[in-house]
Amino acid sequence: MNIMPISEIIEKVTMICKKNNVKRLDLFGSFATGTATPTSDIDFVVYGCDNLMQLEDDLLQIETLRKIDIFDFDSIRNEYLLEDIKKYPKQIY
C-alpha cells in the first residue's frame, strides 16, 4: 500500500470539514513548512467545530499510512504547541 499524497489527503479533509461544519482548519508542522519526511505525521488545528469527536472519527477513516493529529485550538494549553501552530499555519479550510 502506498502513502497517500498530501494533496489527496487535504482534498478528503476539506470534504470532511464541510460535512462537520468546521469554521476553519489549518495544517501546521512539517507538512506546512515543507520539511515532512516519509515518517512524518500530519498535524491539523481546528477552529470552531460543534462536534470535535465526530470530526476526529471521520478524519481517522481516511486511508493513509500516515498518522493524523487534530487539535482543538481553544483547548490547547501547551505554549510550545501554540507557538508552533501560530508560526507556520497553512489554512486549508
Regions found by a protein language model. Give the residues of each.
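Histidine- and aromatic-rich ligand-binding microenvironments
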Residues: 41
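Catalytic core of pol beta-like nucleotidyltransferases
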Residues: 1-26, 32-38, 47-93
